[in-house]
Amino acid sequence: MREPKNAKVLSRLENVLVTQLDVNNFSSIKKSVEKAISHFGRIDVLLNNAGYSVYSPLESTTEEQIHNIFNTNVFGALEVIKAITPIFRSQHNGMIINVSSIGGKMTFPLGCLYYGTKYAIEGISEALTWEMQSIGVKVKIIEPGFTATEFRVEEGAGKHYAEYDNLKQKLYEDLLPKLKTATPPQKIAEVILQAATDESDELRYPTGDYVVEWMALRSKVDDATFLATHRKQMGL
């Protein structure tokens, strides 16, 4: 994990090794993989869960924000997968679980950067199944909705434009009630455990309140109808 000092509870558990890993630091990725192999002798499952979001008009974001979110949410995940693949290949066994989001299947206002990273994770994960199957490795995607965690959310650090204020207000009016009834992280953890142990070839695991019904609606109607329905629900 990024800050091992925060892992007091985990460190007390049996058969748990906590190492420092920052997905934006390839050296720390390599060292963590090496320590895991040295300690356990093998690695069975990789869970890619690092990420954060930026909610802002694209025009109000900075170049640094754009690069940082893709570095963490996408390129960091790729680096971890690349570092661990030789281990899985030598074992001819393993599993990659990538945490995506409902935002990897549909979007909400002002989240083009975040949802862009999640759509990337969806495509990367599905494409990886082809090559990973050749070395005995399964790939799974977890697709949670709103989750009750201390998830990092940034606003745009660039210039403010009043033309987007109404959209921003409507977004928070729509999202805040959903956040109050967000899915407990324990339920997401249960789905991750299921994905890791059910021995199926299932690729995607949508989970959480609203997610299944939204995805069902998304698959049943054309883009114009879905977007119009969503705009109407948000009063836009």
UniProtKB/Swiss-Prot annotation:
Active site: 100 (proton donor), 114 (proton donor), 118 (lowers pka of active site tyr)
Entry's localization field: Cytoplasm; Nucleus
GO annotation (BP), single: phosphatidic acid biosynthetic process
InterPro entries: NAD(P)-bd_dom_sf, SDR_fam, SDR_oxidoreductase
EC number: 1.-.-.-
Pfam families given in the database record: adh_short (PF00106)
CC terms in the record's Gene Ontology section: cytosol; nucleus
Residues involved in NADP(+) binding: 22, 49, 82, 114, 118
UniProt similarity note: Belongs to the short-chain dehydrogenases/reductases (SDR) family.
Protein name per the record: Uncharacterized oxidoreductase SPAC977.08
Organism: Schizosaccharomyces pombe (strain 972 / ATCC 24843)
Organism phylogeny: Eukaryota, Fungi, Dikarya, Ascomycota, Taphrinomycotina
